[in-house]
């Protein structure tokens, strides 16, 4: 695939009901590959409108030829604090800068909503994602302890 052609054909769109199944499928693909699907995953993936949008967050989609090939959610955790969550890019489209474009839109959204903190929770198994997050300005919090994972 031609990287320039792919990059120029991608549009970033906001959550629509028609993308709901794509949000779930894109995320289940990587979650099942590396981990197990947790109850919290199921809630957000099956009901993104109520768990993200209705609570003041947003879900972004990378669209190529009318198909959702990438996604990420900005979840409002508490006033002015957002979590970047449920980020996924279709494997055959990874490495084309799509994840970066989605993250950039997520950060822009948080800034527009006067966020004073954006965080994400990830796993060191996801090396390409870790590098993407670091290069997007995220920093490792050595003191953070999440015993869910």
Regions found by a protein language model. Give the residues of each.
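Conserved catalytic-core motifs of GNAT/GCN5-like acyltransferases
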Residues: 119-124, 130, 134-149
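Basic/polar N-terminal segments that are highly enriched at the extreme N-terminus
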Residues: 1-8
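Acetyl-CoA-dependent GNAT
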Residues: 10, 14-85, 90-92, 103-105, ...
């Amino acid at each position: 695939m031609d990287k320039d052609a792919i990059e120029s054909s991608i549009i970033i769109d906001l959550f629509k009901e028609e993308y709901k199944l794509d949000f779930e499928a894109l995320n289940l693909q990587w979650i099942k590959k590396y981990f197990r699907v947790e109850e919290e995953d199921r809630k957000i993936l099956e009901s993104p409108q109520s768990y993200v949008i209705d609570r003041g967050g947003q879900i972004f989609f990378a669209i190529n030829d009318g198909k959702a090939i990438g996604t990420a959610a900005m979840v409002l955790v508490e006033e002015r604090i957002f979590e970047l969550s449920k980020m996924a890019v279709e494997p055959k489209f990874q490495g084309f800068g799509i994840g970066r474009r989605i993250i950039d839109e997520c950060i822009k959204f948080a800034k527009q909503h006067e966020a004073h903190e954006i965080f994400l929770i990830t796993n060191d198994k996801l090396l390409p994602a870790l590098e993407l997050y670091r290069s997007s300005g995220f920093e490792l919090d050595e003191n953070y302890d999440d015993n869910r994972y």
